[in-house]
Regions:
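Short Cys/His-rich Zn2+-coordinating modules
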Residues: 12-22
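Ligand-binding loop in jelly-roll beta-barrel domains
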Residues: 180-202
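Short acidic-glycine-tyrosine-enriched beta hairpin
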Residues: 163-183
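Short beta-strand His + acidic residue motifs that chelate non-heme Fe in jelly-roll/DSBH
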Residues: 41, 143-146, 164, 181-187
């Protein structure tokens, strides 16, 4: 069962379409996994739609104009446009993984590999809320212990990872900040959506040796 969710403010901003793109993707992925938050977003969207209808209520003398316009639109012949769907799977280390709908049309960089951890940066025009990537932890992989100079969001897509604070399954919306030092690891392998708004800060090992690893994560 999913135990980690966006807060109500994030869900409301998502329903109102006011989030930066990278955070919109994160919430959309979670909502695809989480029926509870999907229902909450549907309720929020319905409330927003009702408020817009009330604000834009048509005056009685203009109602026939709206009806005429609607009738004209409905009478137009429908046109079927073929849509080229991208392959909803990705491959890494000889394994195939299905992607959530929100990520299937997002361009990505080639995979970069450092040891048993890989990263593919998402190519987003809007990076105002940070850099978004796909991260893959191979079976037995562990990220060196670190804290954060900003916000770190990790959302498992396939597989499970854990740290000192718990275990996280596909759909969990895991937010961490500078108050948290942790060492994510996966026993059987885990593909994640990751969002960082600043580089991580390693708390163990030699910083110089880990600089390249930090660049890979960010």
């Amino acid at each position: 069962m999913i135990n980690f969710h966006p807060d109500n403010a994030l869900l409301a901003a998502y329903a109102a379409d006011t989030l930066p793109l990278s955070m919109t993707l994160a919430v959309a992925i979670h909502v695809e996994f989480c029926p509870t938050c999907a229902r909450r977003v549907a309720d929020l969207e319905r409330q927003l739609a009702e408020s817009v209808l009330i604000a834009d209520k048509i005056f009685p003398e203009e109602e026939h104009l709206f009806d005429d316009m609607l009738s004209y639109i409905l009478e137009q012949p429908s046109v079927t446009v073929p849509v080229q769907m991208e392959e909803p799977k990705i491959e890494i280390q000889g394994q195939s993984f299905w992607l959530p709908r929100a990520l299937r049309h997002i361009s990505r960089q080639n995979w970069q590999q450092m040891g048993n951890i890989g990263r593919s940066r998402l190519l987003l025009d809007d990076q105002s809320s940070g850099r978004a990537s796909l991260m893959y932890l191979s079976a037995g992989a562990a990220v060196p212990q670190h804290t954060h100079r900003g916000m770190e969001l990790t959302l498992p897509l396939t597989g499970v990872f854990r740290d000192e604070l718990g275990e996280y399954i596909p759909g969990d919306f895991v937010l961490r900040d500078a108050k948290v030092a942790h060492q994510p690891q996966s026993r059987d392998g885990c593909l994640c959506f990751a969002l960082l708004d600043a580089p991580v800060q390693f708390t163990q090992g030699l910083p110089r040796l880990l600089n390249g690893f930090g660049d890979l994560l960010y």
